[in-house]
Structure formats: structure tokens, C-alpha cells
A protein has these predicted regions:
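Transmembrane helix-loop junctions in multipass membrane proteins, especially transporters and channels
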Residues: 37-45, 74-75, 110
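Membrane-helix interface/capping segments
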Residues: 2-11
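Membrane-embedded catalytic scaffold of the fatty acid hydroxylase/desaturase
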Residues: 55-165
Length: 177
């Protein structure tokens, strides 16, 4: 890492280009995702072409989209957090925000962190475990957080309502196209 030029005293306005790129990615991903969906529905394409486009979109949303969502969820601004939620909803992985902030950051490297691989665990076992345990651990963490405020998990301040609505919105849009 070349950290000799690192300036830790930079103020937010000095990070204009960095912020711009992360902020505009959500609309770019949205337009690309639904543009490809529309293109494949209303254009004559071979099955291999459609599969190729959707695989490419999966790589795009899974690498860039989730990474930008990760970056945005760590920001304090409401716009940044909302864009993170939108990016995660596009890949139906909204619970990641709660899991990452409330579970992973607290229990990283321990057996209580579902996204820390166990010693000698193969990828497929790890992947299935993550898909099953992360939504459960994130919901439990949000429930505990609400419980500290004297609220039940069903309280409307639980972000899982927002996660569900955003994901259903994305699915509904995809069926409308």
C-alpha cells in the first residue's frame, strides 16, 4: 500500500469525485439492470446472449454494487444510507446492512460471525451457511436492538420492513417490464 501520500485530514468537500462516483452508482445500476431486462424481453436474442447478459449483470451488481453499498452504509448521511439500501434491494440482499453493521463488525473472526469462514471450511459449505445464517443473525440483532428500546421486533422502526418493501418493489418492477 502506498500510504506515504495519505492525508487523513481531508474534509468531505475535498472528496467530491470519490463521493460523486459512489452516489451516482445506484441510479446507473438501476438503469443498467432494468435496461438489460427490457432489452432481453423486447429484442430477439439467442438464449446464450441472454444468459451472458444476466451473468455479466450479476457480476456487475455483485462486485461493484455490493461494494458501493458497503461503502455507503458506513456513511452517516441519510442519502448515502438510502442509496446503500437501494443497491442491496436490487440484488435482494437487503439484510446485509444489518448483518454487516450489527453482527460482522462486532463478532468478526469469531464463531458468532456467519461471514467468517471456519478453518478448512470449503467454499460451498461456507456459501450455503452464509445464505442461511446471515438473514437470521441480522434479524436477531435488529430484534435485540429494538428490545433495548423496549420495542418488539414487529415495531415499524425495524428496518426489515424497509428491506422487504424495497425488495418487493424491485421484484414488482422486474415483472412489469
Amino acid at each position: 500500500l502506498r500510504v506515504e501520500n495519505l492525508d487523513t485530514n481531508l474534509k468531505e468537500p475535498q472528496l467530491f469525485w470519490y463521493r460523486l462516483i459512489t452516489l451516482i452508482w445506484a441510479p446507473i445500476q438501476f438503469l443498467t439492470l432494468f435496461g438489460i431486462l427490457t432489452l432481453t424481453m423486447y429484442t430477439e436474442m439467442a438464449l446464450a446472449e441472454k444468459i451472458g447478459l444476466f451473468c455479466a449483470m450479476g457480476v456487475l451488481t455483485g462486485t461493484i454494487g455490493i461494494n458501493y453499498a458497503h461503502e455507503l452504509m458506513h456513511k452517516s448521511g441519510k442519502i448515502e444510507r438510502w442509496l446503500a439500501d437501494a443497491l442491496l434491494a436490487m440484488v435482494l440482499y437487503s439484510h446485509f446492512r444489518s448483518e454487516h453493521l450489527l453482527v460482522h463488525h462486532i463478532h468478526v473472526g469469531t464463531p458468532r460471525d456467519p461471514v467468517t469462514a471456519k478453518y478448512n471450511e470449503n467454499f460451498y459449505k461456507f456459501f450455503i451457511r452464509v445464505l442461511i445464517q446471515c438473514p437470521i443473525s441480522s434479524f436477531k440483532s435488529e430484534s435485540i436492538k429494538l428490545g433495548r428500546k423496549g420495542l418488539p421486533p414487529s415495531d415499524f422502526s425495524n428496518p426489515f420492513y424497509i428491506y422487504f418493501i424495497l425488495q418487493m418493489f424491485m421484484l414488482a418492477l422486474s415483472f412489469l417490464v
